[in-house]
């Protein structure tokens, strides 16, 4: 990697994404400089092995800006003025191009390429970071019309070095895409979670894995999400208007079984449009449900047995029995592997629900 970026990369912003980028680059031998308004964040990230505090008065060949959305344009402009090649990891791209273009000259702007790793967590801060955060995840590279080829190639290689799979996409197209696949799901989770505030505790006692799955991402930092949503308001407003119409249709469909069937079938079909592992086509999967005692070592024993059986787990979920010290583990496997796995687990005395 050093042959195309020199021997240093400066990561500005030592939160979840910035620290994860530092950890990912450090594991492939890149020297990473870290800076942040919070010196505690820098010390924490450095202590985790994500890099070293950036020396005063020195410039790195490549700068990755991982600061809150409102601060990105100014930090990018400052780094471009210092002669660095710069990318940011903000969630919205075209408004940044416009704002940065008002702060720097045309020549400096050629050294800027936006990017957006499609990875994250409902948690924040350097302690939530991981060197593996980007492994196998899409990382959008969003060159604007005057981005230089060298700048685009460099940022693509940086993303690959972090373990990601790169996708080139125009900034406006990116913003429309994330409005649908990221920002809308977050808002739907927020609305569902918000409804729980007024629920009777007896109703909440019936909560299962479904409501946990739907609301998990609603726990994201409200201040950060406010900036993201406002900056992508035009694209998000369009998709929310479509959802508004569909909700009205859904309310009417509750009295029309055939119309309701169509809504539900569209939902099933939509899940098949989401790419599968490593960006490939979605594969047919099935779920195997296993009761696991809530004791130390039991989950590890289950995974060990599945590994010995020779079945690959595509995904998993864990639900807890409200009345007993037992968890229900849902193992998602390839459809053709489900029945053999059920039989093999029962032969090893696991309680399998058919």
Please tell me what each predicted stretch does.
Residues 1-54, 62:
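NAD(P)+-binding Rossmann beta1-loop-alpha1 motif at the extreme N-terminus of oxidoreductases
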Residues 75-127:
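Rossmann-like NAD(P)(H) cofactor-binding subdomain of soluble oxidoreductases
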Residues 37-38, 90, 319:
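Residues in the short beta-alpha loop(s) of Rossmann-like NAD(P)-binding domains
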Residues 133-219:
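Internal alpha-helical scaffold of NAD(P)-dependent oxidoreductase catalytic cores
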Residues 66-68, 90, 143:
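Glycine-rich, N-terminal phosphate-binding loop of Rossmann-like dinucleotide-binding domains
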Residues 200-268, 288:
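Interdomain hinge/lid region at the active-site interface
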Residues 270-354:
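A conserved regulatory-domain signal marking ACT and ACT-like small-molecule sensing domains
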Residues 63-64, 87:
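N-terminal Rossmann-like NAD(P) cofactor-binding module of classical short-chain dehydrogenase/reductase
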């Amino acid at each position: 990697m050093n042959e195309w970026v020199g021997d240093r990369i400066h990561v500005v912003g030592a939160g979840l994404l910035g620290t994860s980028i530092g950890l990912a680059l450090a594991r492939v031998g890149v020297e990473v400089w870290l800076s942040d308004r919070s010196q505690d964040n820098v010390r924490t990230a450095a202590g985790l092995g994500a890099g070293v505090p950036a020396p005063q008065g020195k410039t790195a060949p490549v700068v990755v800006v991982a600061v809150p959305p409102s601060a990105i344009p100014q930090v990018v402009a400052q780094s471009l003025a210092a002669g660095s090649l710069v990318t940011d990891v903000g969630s919205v791209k075209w408004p940044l191009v416009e704002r940065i273009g008002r702060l720097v000259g045309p020549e400096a702007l050629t050294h800027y390429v936006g990017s957006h790793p499609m990875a994250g967590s409902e948690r924040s801060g350097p302690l939530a970071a991981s060197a593996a955060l980007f492994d196998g995840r899409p990382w959008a590279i969003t060159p604007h019309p005057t981005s230089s080829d060298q700048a685009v190639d460099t940022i693509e290689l940086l993303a690959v070095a972090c373990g990601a799979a790169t996708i080139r996409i125009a900034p406006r197209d990116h913003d429309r895409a994330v409005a649908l696949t990221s920002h809308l799901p977050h808002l739907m989770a927020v609305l569902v979670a918000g409804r729980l505030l007024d629920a009777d505790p007896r109703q909440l006692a019936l909560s299962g894995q479904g409501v946990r799955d739907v609301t998990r991402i609603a726990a994201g930092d409200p201040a950060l999400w406010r900036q993201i949503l406002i900056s992508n308001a035009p694209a998000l407003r369009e998709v929310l208007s479509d959802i508004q119409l569909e909700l009205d249709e859904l309310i009417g469909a509750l009295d029309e079984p055939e119309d309701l069937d169509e809504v539900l079938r569209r939902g099933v079909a939509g899940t098949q449009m989401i790419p599968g592992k490593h960006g490939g086509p979605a594969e047919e999967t099935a779920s195997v449900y296993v009761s696991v005692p809530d004791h130390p070592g039991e989950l590890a024993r289950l995974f060990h047995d599945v590994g010995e059986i020779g079945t690959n787990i595509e995904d998993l979920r864990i639900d807890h029995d409200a009345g007993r010290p037992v968890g229900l583990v849902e193992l998602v496997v390839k459809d053709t592997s489900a029945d053999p796995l059920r039989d093999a687990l029962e032969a090893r005395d696991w309680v399998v629900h058919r």
